[in-house]
Amino acid sequence: MRSSGYLNSNNGSSSSLESTNVNKSTDKNQLYLKVVCNCATDLVPQDTTGTGSESKKAYSSSKSINPVLVVQLNNTIKSTSKKLNTNQPSWNDELYMPLKNQDDSSLLIFSVWDKHTRYKNYLGELRLNVKDIFVDNGNFVDKTELKWYHLNSNTKYHSFVTGSILAGFELVIKNKKKRFHSSYNDKFQQLSIDSDVESAFKKWLSSLTKPTIYSVNNKINPNDQGFYDDELVNEFELESVLTERSKKSHLNVPGGNGLLSVPGDDCHDAGSFSDASFLSDGGYASDASANLFDQKETSSDSKKSRIKSKMRLRRSKQEYENFELASRQVLGVVFIEIVSCEDLPPYKNFTRTSFDMDPFVVVSFGKKTFRTGWKRHTLNPVFNERLAFELLPHESNFSIQFLVLDKDHFSFHDNVAHISLPLRTLTEYATAKPTEGDSSDVNTSDSTSFSQTGNGFTTEDTEFPENDSVQIIENETPSNKQSRKRYLSRKKVVGTQLDLKKFKAMSLSLQLHDQKYIGKYAPKLKIRVRFETYTELRKKFWRVLLEESNSTPENRDSCDYIELISLLDTLGCVNSDELVELFYSNLGKSSWGGDLLTFDEIIDQMETYVNQNVESGKVKIFEFEKCPICNEKRVSKKQDLDIITHFAICASKDWSVVGKLLSSSYVTPTQATKKWFTKALIKLTYGKYKLGGNSANILVQDRMTGIIVEEKMSVYVRLGIRLLYKGLDKARSKRVRILLKNMSIKQGKKFDAPQSKSDIASFIKFHKLDLDECEIDDPSQFATFNDFFYRKLKPGAREIEDEKNSKIVTSPADCRSVVFESIDKATQLWIKGAGFTIPKLIHNDHSMRVSSYTLGIFRLAPQDYHRFHSPVDGVIESIKHIDGEYYTVNPMAIRSELDVFGENVRTIVTIKTKDFGNIYFIAVGAMMVGSIVLTKDTGYEISKGEELGYFKFGGSTVLLLIESDKFKFDTDLVKNSSSGLETLLRVGQSIGHSPDVEEYKRDHISFDKLDKSKQLRLIRVLTGGDLKDKHKLSNWEATKIDMEDFQEIEDEEVFDKDMPDEDASIKSED
């Protein structure tokens, strides 16, 4: 083994001087920072109010603390050994951190963790500038003596930190001329200190890529509340470090003994999740020692272990990536608001001329510790800060401690007063009462607030606690004081307005720490408490979702078959069809017979299903990549995996947001234009859902105003996709194809009949259509419904942008568009059909260069103008009609395994142009489209914007194929398409241009500056209805379909010779 290697800094495994770094230094010597991690003290707060042995009683259980120290310098992360069951650990470890050329900064970070098998607790951190360690008043020193450093918390954890660490530092250079020997002493001799250390250190400082003194000092100096402002500790990286260390716990450590393996903690003993802003809760998974020189591990073994560690981390990220409905034993969630303190004793200041009291409150329960912000110079502070945490079964008998401290810059903090009492003393009188008719399990009837009977709690107003230190406050008056501190986490809400009836207000009589103030002052802590049982929270969660998804005002407390499937699909259920069928079967109702399920029935079925199946891990009912309320991802293997607890804690900050963000109907312009909400909604709508579980929600952005609105999928489209996807065998698949084809043809004939004229008025009323732009503005003058459907517009109703410039291509229709610069990008981002190819799409025209074509997809909704126009100037060279299926062109189907464009009925028009060569204009029919009609013939010289044809009733799509070396799409369309967002276009608007000319520039219009009528018209075009009245958006088309007309299909029809073979799409490509 050669001595020219580098220390391993990739994933925190035991350090070695073996060659493990790919980018080897060209210098002869490598500079290292030697960190002597000696010991720590007082890592968790202790009660010092008693005397003798009582003074050692910890507010957090110090007996279960397993401290480990993690050191991070740029990309290098290393950890010490883990010490078991001690609040005063002695590590006596030495960590070597390489100081590499072109490092980012000189910021050195220490973090202390209470590490258990299944979780970790944050105990504080320390930040130092490496330059300040060795340069004192301009004098350089290469070694420092051991020194005590006080730990602080960062703003993310916002925890009460009391610990300190004893550490020393030294700069050393590894001599590469010597080889390794077998003993540790020989290996230590390779690290030498000479005159080159100072020059090497200066060289390293000058090579830093981010050397700004201000930026480093800003990160290492706590704010006025004693918190580090930025979160610099990456939990996933630390997870990799300590997990790798845990695999090597059998190794010996210089200066210490090997660790004995201990059984992993029970999963019920894990610290439960809390999303309060002053949170110190979490979990780590490792137990290992630091081994700088590990001779037993070869370079090859080290590489393999790092690869395995990365694979484990990757699997860990995938497994714990999303919020789910977890099967856990949880009693409920406790909400406590620290309101205020009064009558605190006036501690004298340093000069003893006045009092000095900057109070704050520390709350400790089990392994969870919370801290409020401190209030300056007051004896009656008002906090209005809320915390929340889960109550696990084994914690039901635990005590909760409240400690009031005086912030002191010189002597850490002074104890002022405290109280410790069983948690059940508080929760017994603050447990939310189940609704009437269900005394054991809660079934709330209010989606955004707690609906209770009487006083809303399980105890009467005449009942009071037996503990004299706890007094119930009646007729509480709310405080009007509100503030938001800059230093707090953005999730922290201070002084929020809340319904006082939801919480039980209590006054706690505190015990003074200083005996001389007893009898003179009687400090009290005012709190508000509420305990929600887990069953009640889960049922409340069901009802919130059900009420927000209900779209029919006449059935406010019930759902039909389609609505319930749509809700489950949107939330990520992978077997919604089977689940809803099971509910109907259990209740003896017909799923397709129009029977409705009440909310109570659905909730009962949900509870039964969850209790029977989720615990066994058979199915996931919900899966959120981000929390829909706080928009935060999960960051570690904590037990915040449970969406119910996370929902309760997030919603407790502001219960009004639940209705806004869990709404499954239309999105208001104000909500949709918020970037974070749009991204979250896209993820909830499209993210990682598989076939049969895709969402019914489509986001569309208006090109002129920029507003983003949600479009609802039609019920008949959903029905068609469901039927098609559930066809398991060849005969059943063909049966469904026949059904869809018959449905489209018969519906087309129906709307061509004179009797269909009566449907025009209801269609106009439903979609709120404005006929001012039409040539015929009187609906009674249309002979049939289809005559009205493909109505013509008045001349000049659609402006052709840059009409005289033949190098500008315009939109062929009023549509929702996505565009792609290559076929490969289209198949990666949008078209997921397994058999989709361009030769198949244009029916085996092998003369075209497939890979060199751009693709534009222009989808027409039923409320759109259904005539299509030429996007270019040219001559119609050929027209080809291809018979096929009638699959829906909805994005839900396009992004499935179904090859919609390659199998649907379509007409291909080849237009020969001067600037773009031959372009392919493909009109694709869809479900409920009776036919495609062209108004121009072969040889016709057509102008840009001139009518080319129209679709009869239904949704439809136009595809454009243009050679990519002769054409570029407009940048705004490409950007939206890459994000999965459709753009609303009008006939004549520019969609792209020749590479030798500039993109057409248009003036954008502010939505707020439009008059009211234009705003409503735009919303109706985008959504297909009136945004203000979402309950009327049931579905007009669905009311016009008589399913009995399409269900009588003879078995012999399934094997009709005229029907294409099941494998026809594959054979056509040969």
Curated annotation (Swiss-Prot):
Gene3D superfamilies: C2 domain. Residues 12-149, 315-439 form the C2 domain. GO terms for biological process: filamentous growth of a population of unicellular organisms in response to biotic stimulus; filamentous growth of a population of unicellular organisms in response to chemical stimulus; filamentous growth of a population of unicellular organisms in response to starvation; phosphatidylcholine biosynthetic process; phosphatidylethanolamine biosynthetic process; phosphatidylserine biosynthetic process; protein autoprocessing. Its EC number is 4.1.1.65. Keywords: Calcium, Decarboxylase, Endosome, Golgi apparatus, Lipid biosynthesis, Lipid metabolism, Lyase, Membrane, Metal-binding, Phospholipid biosynthesis, Phospholipid metabolism, Pyruvate, Repeat, Zymogen. The record marks 955-956 as: Cleavage (non-hydrolytic). Residues 1-23, 432-468 are annotated as: Disordered. One of its GO terms (cellular component) is endosome membrane. SMART domains: C2. Is synthesized initially as an inactive proenzyme. Formation of the active enzyme involves a self-maturation process in which the active site pyruvoyl group is generated from an internal serine residue via an autocatalytic post-translational modification. Two non-identical subunits are generated from the proenzyme in this reaction, and the pyruvate is formed at the N-terminus of the alpha chain, which is derived from the carboxyl end of the proenzyme. Binds 1 pyruvoyl group covalently per subunit. CDD domains: C2, C2_PSD. InterPro entries: C2_dom, C2_domain_sf, PS_Dcarbxylase, PSD-B, PSD_type2_pro. It is an enzyme of class 4 (lyase). The active site is at 814 (charge relay system), 869 (charge relay system), 956 (charge relay system), 956 (schiff-base intermediate with substrate). PANTHER family: PHOSPHATIDYLSERINE DECARBOXYLASE (PTHR10067), PHOSPHATIDYLSERINE DECARBOXYLASE PROENZYME 2 (PTHR10067:SF17). NCBIfam families: PS_decarb. Catalyzes the formation of phosphatidylethanolamine (PtdEtn) from phosphatidylserine (PtdSer). Plays a central role in phospholipid metabolism and in the interorganelle trafficking of phosphatidylserine. Important for virulence. The C2 domains have an essential, but non-catalytic function. They may facilitate interaction with PstB2 and are required for lipid transport function. This is Phosphatidylserine decarboxylase proenzyme 2.
